[in-house]
Amino acid sequence: MNRIIFCTFLQKKSEGQDYPPYPGKLGEKIYNQISKIAWKEWKLQQTKLINEEKLNMFNQNDRKKIEKYMKLFLFNNE
């Protein structure tokens, strides 16, 4: 059975994640508030950002930058 949540990104009920897609408290927040559809939209945006800004995910500062973008994209900087 699919888990239905109220997605804060889409502002409607939608199918939730199967598991937290990110570690820690932020991952739990995403699991509880962000739908599969919204997460897929973020993954597309993330790929664009990594390519356009030439971010290196082995670099800690670049990972922090992409996390900041993720929070802004998904939660509109709550």
UniProtKB/Swiss-Prot annotation:
Keyword check for Acetylation: no
Any GO molecular function: iron ion binding
Short name of one Pfam family: Iron_traffic
One of the record's GO cellular component terms: cytosol
The keyword Iron belongs to this UniProt entry's keyword annotation: yes
GO biological process: cellular response to oxidative stress
InterPro entries, sorted: Fe_traffick_prot_YggX (IPR007457), Fe_traffick_prot_YggX_sf (IPR036766)
Record keywords, A-Z: Iron
Subunit structure as annotated in this protein's UniProt entry: Monomer.
Function: Could be a mediator in iron transactions between iron acquisition and iron-requiring processes, such as synthesis and/or repair of Fe-S clusters in biosynthetic enzymes.
Family assignment from sequence similarity: Belongs to the Fe(2+)-trafficking protein family.
NCBIfam families, per the entry: PRK05408.1
PANTHER family found in the cross-reference section: FE(2+)-TRAFFICKING PROTEIN-RELATED
Designated name of the protein: Probable Fe(2+)-trafficking protein
